[in-house]
């Protein structure tokens, strides 16, 4: 993978002391020692808590010391080969991006390019050796690396594509001089290289077929570091393909994953949420509403059970998922677990009613899509040296969402047919046509459309995410016998098991 180097600066001990407070130096040395000793508990403490505490104490309104000073500090102490020297820039630039939204810290084009270079250097550090690195890092840190790598790629694409006056001629020149910086092909290759090195697909395939994954893995596959990097890179690829609008490819990436036994991805809650959200959205856009329901409902139940101090707080993402669930429910109602249905109606009940009634449906669909859909990306510009003539990302989002809205409008009309069919067991075509203000030939065409739209590919347990069986997914089925419609309404008996499990889960959670 491409990497550009810059002229090294001569850093003296005086420079280090002037830019890195002594207490911060001690903290970084302690952090480095924890990594060298492979003490995951100590690493987690430094990564999760002490970093935040040190930031608040010394760098509340400013940046951490630049990576060159930290590198020089460890070189002065004869530890230039320390893993921490390669890991620190990732922490540094992630902190810059995070705090740019609520401080006076600004991200420059130089920052964006430098962060890209450090990420490529870091990924090369993992994939280039012939033997696994003698390194252990917490799963959350590994996920955060992949998550931040993709976030910064998305942010760069948005920044480069934005039509505004914030970018100067110098910015455009810097971007043009580095055409491969944050190039989508290089980003994809970086994730694929981690997946290949980790042998994660081979292990997942073995697991699905009932074999021992460890026996299928080589030295890299047996390393926890590489195994988790491979897992998280798979989820990152799903996310990236989803943002690029390639929904089938996003599902194909997970071909070796049993979606009903995905415990390895739940080791980091944020990773688990990302996987469910992006796969669910892909199913939604592919008109596989039943599968979307299943994933959205499952993750909302899991998120509810992990609330509380010390747990992942995905409030914003939860609301986003609820919007997509409400959208799918409005178009094709399904039976939901009681607590999920209550949450959905509480937050988006009004929009559901608007869509199902047809009054204000366009406004409600727009609201749910804009709040629930991911940010679509168009990673290429006609001329990187010139400001774009239009907001290409907005245009791409409008194109993707318009495709879904066309489908939604058809389903809303079919929903009106469903509401009449549920009231009868037999009904004359002419009678229903009068209710709908249609001719009988028009109604016949609509009934054919109803049958087609309600027949969907549904994932089969243990099968690949993209595969499935065609099933009729509506609660109302019918056939036309001459000039009469024969209707069968399928009802599901109330299951008290769900209520019992939900109450038990709440009791366990409240007693923690």
UniProtKB/Swiss-Prot annotation:
Residues 291-477 form the PCI domain. GO terms for biological process: formation of cytoplasmic translation initiation complex; translational initiation. Component of the eukaryotic translation initiation factor 3 (eIF-3) complex. GO terms for cellular component: eukaryotic 43S preinitiation complex; eukaryotic 48S preinitiation complex; eukaryotic translation initiation factor 3 complex. Keywords: Cytoplasm, Initiation factor, Protein biosynthesis. It holds the Pfam family Paf67. InterPro entries: eIF3l, PCI_dom. The keyword Cytoplasm applies. It comes from Monosiga brevicollis. It is found in: Cytoplasm. This is Eukaryotic translation initiation factor 3 subunit L. PANTHER family: EUKARYOTIC TRANSLATION INITIATION FACTOR 3, EUKARYOTIC TRANSLATION INITIATION FACTOR 3 SUBUNIT L. Coiled coil: none annotated. One of its GO terms (molecular function) is translation initiation factor activity. Belongs to the eIF-3 subunit L family. Component of the eukaryotic translation initiation factor 3 (eIF-3) complex, which is involved in protein synthesis of a specialized repertoire of mRNAs and, together with other initiation factors, stimulates binding of mRNA and methionyl-tRNAi to the 40S ribosome. The eIF-3 complex specifically targets and initiates translation of a subset of mRNAs involved in cell proliferation.
